[in-house]
Amino acid sequence: MPNWCCNELAVIGKKEEVERFYNSFKDTNEFFENNIPTPKELADVKATFSKTPDSEESNRLYEKYGATDWYYWRIENWGTKWDISELQLTEEDDNGEGNLKYYCFRFDTAWSPPEEGIRKLSELYKDVLFHLQFEEPGMCFEGFYKCMNGIVLSQLTVESYTKIDQITDNYIEEYELSLESQKEENNIINNGIEDESV
């Protein structure tokens, strides 16, 4: 039985994209499997708990998927071995104008926060800010992880109970700042300008 990591995920962005994300799993609670599915060929392979391929079939799977079984594939692509557990929708709001939507979820994951899965979700749902806060009391660590459009905006992991000061209460403002930052970064990239101060 694993240690459980407690997660809170705030998702904010354009109403259509945020609702598309919510609708992808609301009936099944298969948060990652419905968006970043485990390759069918690996789903039935018994976990070997060894990263070293030891057979021709293992070598073939590793070449094709970067993993020899479902366990290592999920660790690499979701950041956790199982999909989420104990999902709760804790908040739902908008900006009052009908164009932005905000959801906040609580859920558990096995052993660790699903950072890579959240980053990959942010690639699938454009201009949506994913802000994950987590705590793993068994191993005494906590932190946060923010990303948008597949780019990690900020992250921090510390020993538990040191109190994270960076937690925000205003997700709408945070979303607008993150979107503006993304636009500035895209302008720099598109114009071929490198900012040496970053």
What do the PLM-derived regions correspond to, one by one?
Residues 1-198:
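Intrinsic low-complexity, intrinsically disordered or marginally ordered coil/linker segments
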